[in-house]
């Protein structure tokens, strides 16, 4: 009797337990139905199309080591932007829609630029892309900031190939420069048999209908000058002509039976920004803004003979691009993994030729996809917005893509288990940025908030008369409000001590004259007022140089000695343009005992607690004046 009562109780408990879960499941389904779909408002590509076979190419570029999302706190509102967990979810949604018809390709600059990449020696990125099923990548400009040994290690760890047809090893006399997993191009096979298109063709009793579609991908690395390569071990490496290598490889792929050829290149293009941020489905007939005809990728595409390539996944310029240059579709995204785009290639069976052909008029681009935990309901994005304007964008809501909720994907759980504890301490708040609602971005003009904060701290820590820094070393932006520790570490990812040395006024003038017309212009300074003029050939040059304390200008005495500060990477290792300066100048009174520049910036800002950026830049009295 006792056992039967236990059984009845057990059955009742199970029934109650099951019933209690039913409303939750129903509520969840209802909740998902109510989510906004960021892809609503245009016609999607139909995976079950009976006329065309679509292959979806997901393109990423310039992720710069950002595995974790960027945390934003605007007034009372907290949200995030980016994060590979959410990018992974998009890709898996597509894979469910287009089984075995998704190609995930990365166009370079994968490692340099984040705290987590530094902490893991870049391994967090390779491990993540391995788990996400990346199909191929190429080398970006900042891949060469690392040693060749580092790059070869990353290539060997990758479960995907690195593609680059224009890198040549002069010593080994081969294009396969960085190991067995680096190849110049690759063919990808897609099974057509599980589609309505193929089944309909078979029902028509057509003979010898191909059951696969083969496309090729040619990789091109950014062409680098010797002076631009910061890593060691590349003395034997040279870069071959873009057009020649692409044409040769594309022809070989076509001869091998590839129906379409896609270029994967860390080469940049900039297109007008007016219509670039709204998620949409773009076609060759879509209205689009202009693209800069002087950019490398534009010129390369324009130089090609017809039929060489059918699409491009680009990078380097950190721009949202979903444009056609004549009849070639190009996708590229902003940096840090905040966006991605999809290139849909359609294929149709040509009965008379008994082959599949790509139909360029039906190519579509979907993007830019916002990589977000939540989106603003009105903009369907999660970018930084000003505190005074945030109410115009609210609320922040969960969302779906192609009918499926975008949420943190569990594909990368093992990465979190391995690295979260190591990274968590970098979420500590260091200070609060005030005085502006604008993002503090890196600029090339040599006089901007972020750069001026760095050079000001150099001067305060060393007491130098003049401080110099390279904008090329700064790798991220800061937003107003609370500044976490990882933002400081993302800004300067290299470990390098702050140094002082002695120079005469004449030597400072010679150095600045070279730096401000070198490869990495314009250098950031504290303690100097510069006038930059243009010569008859249209080239800028340093025409005047004075000492400057932020208010008053005084003459730089040519024979007098001054204390100068910069980082060890520049003055001791000859980084960037300093290699040529060290050809004629030997540092005197060199002292590099001040500590790491990143540690010093963190220490100073933490002590300040509140940092008003308005004191770091005077619009009416700039440190650099340009005269045409």
Segments from the language model and where they lie:
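Acidic, metal/ion-coordinating pockets
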Residues: 25-368, 373, 445, 449-457, ...
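Bacterial Sec-dependent signal peptides at the C-terminal "C-region" and cleavage site
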Residues: 17-24
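Short amphipathic alpha-helical segments that mediate assembly, nucleic-acid/protein binding
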Residues: 5-8, 297, 412, 578
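Compositionally biased, low-hydrophobicity segments enriched in charged and small polar residues
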Residues: 15, 115, 128, 473-478
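Cleavable N-terminal signal peptides of Sec/SRP-targeted secreted and luminal proteins
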Residues: 4-17
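Catalytic centers of hydrolytic enzymes
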Residues: 29-96, 196, 200, 228-243, ...
